[in-house]
Amino acid sequence: MQRLQRGLVLLLWAGLGILAITALASFYVDLAWFAELNALPVLWTRVLARWGLGLGAFAFALAVVGSNIRACWRGASTAGAWAIALGLSGGLAWSLSQHWFALLLWLHQVPVGESDPIFGRDLGFFLFGLPFWETLQQWCFNLVLLTLITVALIYLVELGLSEQRLTLALSLFAQRHLLILGGALFLLRAWGHWLERYELLYSTRGVVFGAGFADVHATLPATTLMSGVAFLTAVGFWALARQGIRFNLPLFKSWCPAWASSLLAPALLWGAYLGFGLLTTRLYPQLLQTLLVTPNELELERPYIEHNIRFTRAGFGLAEVEVKPFPEEGSLTWEILQQNQSTLRNVRLWDTEPLLATYRQLQEIRPYYQFPYVDVDRYRIGGELRQVMHAARELDFAQVPPAAQTWVNRRFFYTHGYGLTLSPVNVVTAEGLPDFFLSDIPPRVSPRYPEVAQVLRVEQPALYYSELTTTDVFVGAEARELDYPAADRYVYSSYRGTGGVPIPHLWQRLLYAWHFRDLRILLSRELSPSTRFLYRRQIRERVRQVMPFLLYDQDPYLVIQGGRLYWFFDAYTTSSRYPYSEHLPGFPFNYIRNSVKAVLDAYNGSIDWYIADPRDPLIQAYARIYPTLFKPLEAMPEPLRQHIRYPQDLFRVQVQQFATYHMTDPRVFYNREDQWQIPNQFRKRRRLPMQPQYLILTLPEDPQKGSPNQPEFVLLSPFTPLNKQNMVAWMAARCDGENYGKLLVYEFSKQRLIYGPEQVEARVNQDPAISEQIALWNEHGSRVNLGTLLVIPIETSLLYIQPLYLEAEQGRLPQLTRVIAAYEDRVVMEPTLSQALEALFSPTGSRRSNR
């Protein structure tokens, strides 16, 4: 027996030792990784906040649970009582420690400077304070509830379940103990009801999101009253505990056992509380909503509709949208086109999907190189802004031949991708393929474009950090890395950057081997004192590890600057706690700002975090929590700042909200008299909403502005009326310089018909010459793909451009074969954009050749 006990003790200590080593290895891996990024304060803030909150909660819970257990379990062993107390306290402490960031936000909150319309409290209370107080109230309630249940079970188990022993169990001391805990529960419910008042600002009862007439005039006073009722119920429980009241009236003696009579008084109090709550907070508001509000909805809900409109526009960054009428004078002519060559030279003829397929066929070079995505950017080349598309040539180890997927190759040989391919959006070769500015391995600037050599030179093309990089590698070791394949040989290299963690000591290798469950890290002879370990190289994982509280745009993009490659991330601060702000279906937030731009060095893996919207209260609080992490946007080098762009994910959300919330008159909003929608386009054999498009264009001139507008990089999306196809407006997000982040909406006159994208698409499909040519191609073994229909504002008119791609049935090399152009009621199809525009507008051009 003693051997068994000793064996169990040894097994227990061995298990604890394994857990300790695992925790130590995991912590060291994090510590070294954050140190590599110069972000140790971020890690220490996280650790200290979590452990500080957890230990504080543990001590408080242990005091509450332990004292109550010892009070009722007076004859029990100390070990048994403490085992229960430690178990409950540990679980409760762990649950509260998960909310450490809510505590930090509360401690570092900032005022928003605007108050809610119902309680008059600064919005910072709802963003920072209310979530923390609700978490704390719920935790305290759970603590007392679990204590009450535990104490009640101890009384029952300790004294048995017979009526005689139950009577003993419910002695005066036991009654008082349970009643005191019951009173504490109701006191916490009183606190909970008080906090529930503020939750009315997120009500979904009325015609719009947020507190409506019934919420303010019925639910709010009822919830306030219930807070008082819960407090009085708590006082009633404590009064019963002090007096030890039993219901020994003759009415009850005849049928009520002695032990049950002890529960009758608190049960009546609890029942009265529930009944009163049901009447006041459920039945009365519903009756008021049905009998008074619904028949007079617009009249009674009007001020609350105004609140919803104002706060939704503020929550989604739409409060400062500048709405202008689109100029109607004049029409588009050949002469006007010649004056807008900067726009025409940047018409995007390549869609991402066909261009990506072409890049993969022509430029991946080796099977283990992959182009995961195509991105859009702009560069100033020869003094002119040029829109380009590019893709990073990333290493995908999964594509290495299976026979070569060895541990050595995974860890030492296949370590990085190489360079990128870049082409202008509007240039096509005679074969219908993209004409590259930058291509091949090593990256080579096309001799046809010598002016781009200085701007697009790439001196360090190695991509050690990218979107497909999921392997952890050792660099600077004895083994050579594959740098890139040349024509008749392979070129090898050795990492010379600052990324990764040095592992010169055996104990470090031991911890990494333990953490990654890979004994070969400890045994490999390839490792040397100069070896660096690069892990967490997938760029999305990398930024999320540092700042998991930001929401990241799904489209990071690569930028060339100073011969190096950088990944740009758009990051958002979000909240679901902005009062009166309407949620979009499928999105968990009702407040969003693009407050952070993160720049990640593709060679070294370092990350710089810049505050793009210093007015955002959330990022102000984050900057207080992590004072050494964030930099002002002005600290970003100017050449990099020229590549900041308005993010598509944010713009999509704003466009969807603005389709409804451009209506600021409550009556118009209530009736949805002017509801807009995003037009659809036929893609992949089904109708899909049009996606916003980056364009370089010159915005219509403002008569009050002295100087003419210059070409600029914008993100554009059109609007049509709900269930209609004519265009009513278009929205643009500006991306350049001091105008970055400004939103413009140009509205068309309601008396003028402007063809929308779906109508233009229908005209293209119905054009006899175009339809005949497409059918002819399809009959000869080719597959015709119509690209994105582009809406291009030029001065006071709209021009539509749509590329057409041909792809062999058995091939994967799309070719840009034709360009369709449409203006007003005219449609043409020509081999090139210039020919299409000439056919459409030139006095000497053929109006409808449709070749």
Swiss-Prot record:
GO cellular component, one term: plasma membrane
Keyword line: Cell membrane, Membrane, Transmembrane, Transmembrane helix
Localization, UniProt: Cell membrane
Topology term for the membrane: Multi-pass membrane protein
Spans traversing the lipid bilayer: 7-27, 47-67, 76-96, 141-161, 168-188, 220-240, 259-279
InterPro entries, alphabetized: UPF0182
Family in the record: Belongs to the UPF0182 family.
Full protein name: UPF0182 protein CYA_1810
